[in-house]
């Protein structure tokens, strides 16, 4: 596995969940995610923090908490109100890296979702 950096977009391998998959509006693995943990944690820890990406649709629209990002020219929504911890072994392939302004929008969305302002 290569160097994992904040702002990278990685595919996160699906985790088997006993009794089924997600419940309600949960987002889970088996999809791309943006690494949001800082680079020091990314180098030293076996776990990283991610924000999963999803396709825009009627239920999930872009807003201050869930900004739009572009990965390989495709529009996705960063689901910032569902930050997840992921073991590095689940990161299967690096897809891209978000633009600086997109990472800033994600960080702002997390701060709003967690009331860190």
Language model features: what each stretch is:
Residues 1-117:
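Conserved functional hotspots at enzyme active or ligand-binding sites that engage polyanionic ligands
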